[in-house]
Amino acid sequence: MGKLIKLITTLTVLVSLLQYCCEFNSGSISCERTQTLCHYTNPRVWNTYFSRNCELYKNKVSPGFDIVARKYDTAVKPVIDDATVKVNKVAIQPAFKVIHSQCKKWNCGKYYQLVRSPMVKTRRFFFAKYNAFVKPNLDKFFTAEFRSHLKERILKYKNIGHYYFTITSRCIKSKYDFIVGNTEEKLMGKFKNKDTHGIHGSVTREPSSEDMVLTVSTMESDEEELTTTSTQTVVETITLDQEEASAVANHAHDDEASTDVEGSTDVNVNEQALLQEDFDMWSETILQKTQDVIQLFEKDVSKYINGKLVEEANHFKAKFQSLDDKSKKFFSKISLAINDIECVEGIDSETGKKIFFDKSGSTEISQYITRELVREYFNETRSTLDELTNAMEKDLSEITDEIEKKVNAIREENVEVFEEWGDIIVNEWSKRMAYVDVINAHMGADDDTTLDEEKAKSSVNWKKFLKGKKQIIESRDKLAHHSADLSRVNAFRQKVQKKILSFTQESGEFLYILRSKANLQFQERERKERERKEREKAAAEEFQRQQELLRQQEEEDEEDVSYTSTSTITTTTTMTL
C-alpha cells in the first residue's frame, strides 16, 4: 500500500511538473510538438471529457474539480510563478554563471579518456558474453522477416525520438544560451580533434541489422569506432564555426583530414535526406497543430458558454420569479376588485356620506368598484407584464449577441496564435533550408553529377516548403471559418423564449377568465340594480296610488260631511218655521 501511495505521489508530481512546463513553454516553437502530450495529461481536458460523457461525474465530481481548479489558478499558481522567478533569479542563474566560469578553466579531454577507457572494456566484455551465450538463441528467434520488420519500427521510432530530442535541446538552449553562451562548443573543441574519425564515421553509412551485434574480432581491435547513429552528432558536426574547423584541421593527420572531407559530404547528403523526411513530419505537425488549435478553441468556447449560461440561467430564474410575483400581485388585486363588485351600500352615521362594504357587509372597501376601474386594472396588468416580457426578450437577444461576439473574439485570438506559430515555423524552416543550401554550396562535391543531384533535391525541398506554407495558410482559413458549437446557446434561448411564451399565454388566459368573471359580476350587479330600481319604482307607484286613493277617500268623506251638515240645517230651519 505504501509503494502504491509513493507511485501515485510520484506520478502526480511528474504530471504537475509536466503541466507547468507546458504552460511555461506554450509560446516556444521548439516545444510545440510536445503539446499533444501536454494535452492528454491535462486534468482539465479529462474533466471536460468525462463531464460530457458521464452524468454521474458531471453532477458529483466536476463541480468539486472546478472549485479546486479556480482555487489553484487564484491561490496556488501565482505563488508558484513568483517562486519560480525568484529561484531562477537567486539560484539557477548564479549557478550557471559559476559553472560557466569553472568550465572555462576545465580541460575535459583527460577526464573523457579516463571515463571512456573503462566503458570500452566493459562494452567488450558485454558483447563477448552476448556473442557467446545470447546471440545463438536470438538468431533462432529473430528471422530475416522479423528483423526487417523490427528494423523499420526501430528506424521510425528513432527518427521520432531524434526529432523530440532535437527540439528539446533547442528549447533548453534557447532559454539558457544567454547564460551559458557557447560553453558546449568550447568543451567539445577540447577533444574533438582527438576523436574526429569517430565523429565522422558515425555518419558515413546507414547502419544495418548486423551493426547492432558486433563480432568478437571487432571487439578486440584497438581502434574503436563510434557506431552511434544519432543525428544530433550530425548537427554538431555541421554547426562547427570556422575557427573550430580550422583547429580540427590543424591538429588532425592528413589521412584524417581526407576522412573529414568525405564525412562532410556525407553529412550534406544525410542532411538533405533528413530534410526531405522532416517535411512529412512538418505536414503532420501542421495537421496536429490545426487540430490542437481547433480543440483549444472549442474548449475555450465551451468553457465560456458553460459559465455564461449558468450565470444567465440564475439571472433569468430571478427575473421569472419577479415576473411571477408581480403577476400574482396584479391578479390578486383584480380578484379582490371582482369580489367587491357585489358590494353593500351604507350611510356613515357621523358624516352622512355613502360608504360601501363587501358583500358580507363586515368590511368597508376603499371605493365603489366600477367597470372603468376594473378595466384600468386590466390594462395596467397587461401593459406591465408586456413590458417585463419584452425586456426579458431584449436581454436574451443581447446575451446571444454578447456570446457570439465573445466566440468571435476567441476565434480571432486562436487564429492569431496560429498565425504567429505559422510565421515562426515558416521562418525557422526557411532558415534551415537556406542554411542547408549554404552548406551545400561551400561543402559540396566537385562532381557535376552530384552537384546536380543536390540542386534537384534542394529544388524539391523548396517546393515542399512552399506546399507546407500553403498548407499553413489553408489551415489558418479553416480555423477562421470554423463554426463554434452554439447548440447549448440556442437551446437556452429556445427554452427561455418558450417559457416567456408559456407565461404570456397563461397570463392571457387567466386575465381572460378574470375579465369574464368581472363581466358576469357586473351583469349580476346591474341586474340586481335594475330589479331594485324596478321594485323601488313599483313601490313608489304603489305608494303614489295609495296616496291618491287616500286623497280621494278623504275628499269623499269631506263631501259626505258637507252634505250632512246642509241637510241638518235645512231640517232645523223647516222645523223652526
From Swiss-Prot:
Coiled-coil zones: 379-416, 513-561
Subunit structure, interactors included: Component of the mitochondria-localized RNase mitochondrial RNA-processing (RNase MRP) composed of one single RNA encoded by the NME1 gene and at least 31 proteins. Absent in the nucleus-localized RNase MRP (NuMRP).
Name used for this protein in its record: Outer spore wall assembly protein SHE10
Organism whose genome encodes this protein: Saccharomyces cerevisiae (strain YJM789) (Baker's yeast)
Start and end residues of each stretch annotated as Disordered: 525-577
Positions with biased composition (Basic and acidic residues): 525-545
The keyword Transcription appears for this protein: no
Regions that span the bilayer: none
Role description: Involved in spore wall assembly. May be a component of the mitochondrial RNase MRP (MtMRP), a ribonucleoprotein endoribonuclease involved in the cleaving RNA transcripts to generate primers for DNA replication in mitochondria.
UniProt entry keywords in alphabetical sequence: Coiled coil, Mitochondrion, Ribonucleoprotein, Signal, Sporulation
Taxonomic placement: Eukaryota, Fungi, Dikarya, Ascomycota, Saccharomycotina
Gene name tied to this protein: SHE10
Bias type Low complexity, positions: 562-577
Family in the record: Belongs to the SHE10 family.
